[in-house]
Amino acid sequence: MGIVFNYIDPVAFNLGPLSVRWYGIIIAVGILLGYFVAQRALVKAGLHKDTLVDIIFYSALFGFIAARIYFVIFQWPYYVENPSEIIKIWHGGIAIHGGLIGGFIAGVIVCKVKNLNPFQIGDIVAPSIILAQGIGRWGNFMNHEAHGGPVSRAFLEKLHLPNFIIENMYINGQYYHPTFLYESIWDVAGFIILVNIRKHLKLGETFFLYLTWYSIGRFFIEGLRTDSLMLTSNIRVAQLVSILLILISISLIVYRRIKYNPPLYSKVGALPWPTKKVK
C-alpha cells in the first residue's frame, strides 16, 4: 500500500532555475476569486470600482510579511540557530493568524487614508477572505503539509474521498487526517452563510461573524494537526488565538449594538471614515 499512483508534485513547472509551486498558484487564484466576489458587493454599496485595489494589495503584502514574522517568532529557537532560513519562504512556514493581523492593520490604515468606513469595507471583504482561505488550503494539500495525525487508509475510504486525495495523504509511509480538506469545507460553508445573511446584519457584524466562524472551525481542526505552533508543551497558539478572536468578536457585536445601534449593512450607501460615532 506504500505505492502512490496519483502523487502530486508540489512544483507545477520550472522557469529556468525558478520552481513555480502549486501552493503559490492556488493562493493567487484564491485572492483573485475573492477580489471578484468582493467587487460585486462593492458596486452594490455604491463605492468606486477601484476602491479595493489598494486595500487588497497592501493587505495581501503586509499580511504575507506578518504571516512569516508570526511563524518565525513562535519558532524562534530554530531560526536563531538557522538565521538564513528566515527569508526562505519557499521552505514553508507562514501562519494564517499572523496574516490576518497584518492584513487587518494594513486594511484599516488604507481605509483611513482613503476616507473609507472600515466596518463597511470589512463586511464587503469578509466573505471573500474566508473563500480565499478555503481555496488556499488546497495549496497545503499540494505541498503535502498541514495535515493531521496518523489514520488508516480504511478510515479515509470511509469518508468517501477521491483516490487522489487518499493517495496523497500517504506521506512518509503513513496515512494522515486531511485537515486541509476539513478546513476548506468549513471555510466554503462560512462563505455561503456570510453572503446569504450579510444583508440582514448590522454594519460591521459580517466581519466579526467571519472571525467567529473561522475561529470555531480552526480551534477544533487545529487539535488534529501535527505541525501546530506551540506556546507551551500543551497549548497550541492557534487554538488560544481562536478563543480570543471568538470572545472579542462576539463582545464587539454586543457592545456596538448596545452603544451605537449601527444601521443594517444593506441600508447604507458609501460611508466615510467614522469620526464621532462608530456606526
UniProtKB/Swiss-Prot annotation:
InterPro entries on file: Lgt
Entry binding sites for a 1,2-diacyl-sn-glycero-3-phospho-(1'-sn-glycerol): 137
Protein localization: Cell membrane
A cellular-component GO term for this protein: plasma membrane
UniProt topology in membrane: Multi-pass membrane protein
Pfam short name (any one): LGT
UniProt GO MF annotations: phosphatidylglycerol-prolipoprotein diacylglyceryl transferase activity
UniProt keyword Transferase present: yes
Keywords: Cell membrane, Membrane, Transferase, Transmembrane, Transmembrane helix
Pathway noted in the entry: Protein modification; lipoprotein biosynthesis (diacylglyceryl transfer)
Principal location listed in the UniProt entry: membrane
PANTHER family per the UniProt record, alphabetical: PHOSPHATIDYLGLYCEROL--PROLIPOPROTEIN DIACYLGLYCERYL TRANSFERASE, PROLIPOPROTEIN DIACYLGLYCERYL TRANSFERASE
Entries under HAMAP family matching the protein: Lgt (MF_01147)
Annotated function: Catalyzes the transfer of the diacylglyceryl group from phosphatidylglycerol to the sulfhydryl group of the N-terminal cysteine of a prolipoprotein, the first step in the formation of mature lipoproteins.
Family that this chain belongs to: Belongs to the Lgt family.
Protein name: Phosphatidylglycerol--prolipoprotein diacylglyceryl transferase
